[in-house]
């Protein structure tokens, strides 16, 4: 069974580094264009997460795949936090905190995927990339809470938390032991 790839790459998509700056349906402020279609990259990453997380190798077919990889790894980080939450409201607070926490971007020490991501070309691109990744993190965390928490008992679903120990591409956005 092959890994799932992003279908959202258009020829006129703007790039930051070698990562696609894709439109998203977001309530958070950031550089991403507003998405008008039903499905955006965050929906795609959440939908394909359970299948893609099992892959140790992932062939990058376009720049949108790099965005998909980042969100997939971020979902893994979110699940580590959400499994410890007792309610959806606590989960939303954790996701907000994780989304705005300082994080490394491509080209910085501590970023685990420097081999496959190009660093920003200049200071302006650096700021756009950081803002875009933060916008993706905030939106992903919020939407993931909707999927992970069972509306009947307000607890995290075991069908999501069972993926906490899985590492996509043998990588993690957090440091070793976190």
UniProtKB/Swiss-Prot annotation:
MF terms from GO for this chain are: actin binding
Q: Alphabetically, which GO biological process terms does the record hold?
A: Arp2/3 complex-mediated actin nucleation; regulation of actin filament polymerization
Show the cross-link location (Glycyl lysine isopeptide (Lys-Gly) (interchain with G-Cter in SUMO2)).
14
Q: Per the record's keyword annotation, is Phosphoprotein included, yes or no?
A: yes
Q: Where in the cell is it found?
A: Cytoplasm, Cytoskeleton; Cell projection; Nucleus
Predominant place of localization: cytoplasm
Sequence positions bearing Phosphotyrosine: 47
The UniProt entry, under Pfam families, shows:
P21-Arc
Sites bearing N6-acetyllysine, chain numbering: 56, 61
Q: Which GO terms describe its cellular component?
A: Arp2/3 protein complex; cell projection; cytoplasm; cytosol; nucleus; site of double-strand break
UniProt KW keywords = Acetylation, Actin-binding, Cell projection, Cytoplasm, Cytoskeleton, Isopeptide bond, Nucleus, Phosphoprotein, Ubl conjugation
- Superkingdom of origin: Eukaryota
The UniProt function text for this chain reads:
Component of the Arp2/3 complex, a multiprotein complex that mediates actin polymerization upon stimulation by nucleation-promoting factor (NPF). The Arp2/3 complex mediates the formation of branched actin networks in the cytoplasm, providing the force for cell motility. In addition to its role in the cytoplasmic cytoskeleton, the Arp2/3 complex also promotes actin polymerization in the nucleus, thereby regulating gene transcription and repair of damaged DNA.
Family recorded in the similarity comment? Belongs to the ARPC3 family.
Record's subunit section: Component of the Arp2/3 complex composed of ACTR2/ARP2, ACTR3/ARP3, ARPC1B/p41-ARC, ARPC2/p34-ARC, ARPC3/p21-ARC, ARPC4/p20-ARC and ARPC5/p16-ARC.
Give the protein's recorded name.
Actin-related protein 2/3 complex subunit 3
Q: What is the organism of origin for this protein?
A: Bos taurus
